[in-house]
């Protein structure tokens, strides 16, 4: 990134930010769809039942925990790669 001009760096950073937003929105949309399809099955009322609400909360918590675990493993892997490259 040091070889890029200031304008090129800004362009690259903007593209990276747009990509991150797009990836986040895709993941969020997938989460919403998965939890909705798994938990909401009664369409006779506008309100979400207590059972559905609890299911959605558990679904989101599991997803957040899995994303944290993936992030932790990714950071560990990157640290190992960095250590190997610095040898």
Curated annotation (Swiss-Prot):
InterPro entries in the cross-refs: Mito_inner_translocase_sub (IPR050673), Tim10-like (IPR004217), Tim10-like_dom_sf (IPR035427)
Cell compartment(s), UniProt: Mitochondrion inner membrane
Disulfide feature: 35-59, 39-55
A Gene Ontology term for the protein's cellular component: mitochondrial inner membrane
Membrane topology of the entry: Peripheral membrane protein
Motif position, Twin CX3C motif: 35-59
UniProt GO molecular function: metal ion binding
UniProt record similarity statement: Belongs to the small Tim family.
Name the UniProt record assigns to this protein: Mitochondrial import inner membrane translocase subunit TIM9
Organism listed in the record: Gibberella zeae (strain ATCC MYA-4620 / CBS 123657 / FGSC 9075 / NRRL 31084 / PH-1) (Wheat head blight fungus)
Gene that produces this protein: TIM9
